[in-house]
Amino acid sequence: MAHKKAGGSTNNGRDSESKRLGVKRFGGESVLAGNILVRQRGTKFHAGINVGIGKDHTLFAKATGVVKFEKKGPKMRSFITIVAE
């Protein structure tokens, strides 16, 4: 009799949901206080003037104004500031 051995099971075949990280408001954009600027893991971007940081390192606007990206310091870190209007 012709028989076929049963195929083995696999541990693959699933993926995690995307976390929708990244910059949400770009340089030159007008924002309101409370708007989320960046969702990130760790501090790829640092909080500058009028910008707050959440417990998951999310950066948000503390004041209404215009978004400005800048690199400063000896390590040329990226800072996001809000220039108040």
UniProtKB/Swiss-Prot annotation:
Family per record: Belongs to the bacterial ribosomal protein bL27 family.
Region Disordered, residue ranges: 1-22
PANTHER family: LARGE RIBOSOMAL SUBUNIT PROTEIN BL27M (PTHR15893:SF0), RIBOSOMAL PROTEIN L27 (PTHR15893)
Domain of life: Bacteria
Organism in which the protein naturally occurs: Psychromonas ingrahamii (strain DSM 17664 / CCUG 51855 / 37)
InterPro entries documented for this protein: Ribosomal_bL27, Ribosomal_bL27_CS
Biological process annotations from GO: translation
Organism lineage string: Bacteria, Pseudomonadati, Pseudomonadota, Gammaproteobacteria, Alteromonadales
The protein's name in its UniProt record: Large ribosomal subunit protein bL27
Coiled-coil residue windows: none
Entry keywords, A to Z: Ribonucleoprotein, Ribosomal protein
GO cellular component term, pick one: cytosolic large ribosomal subunit
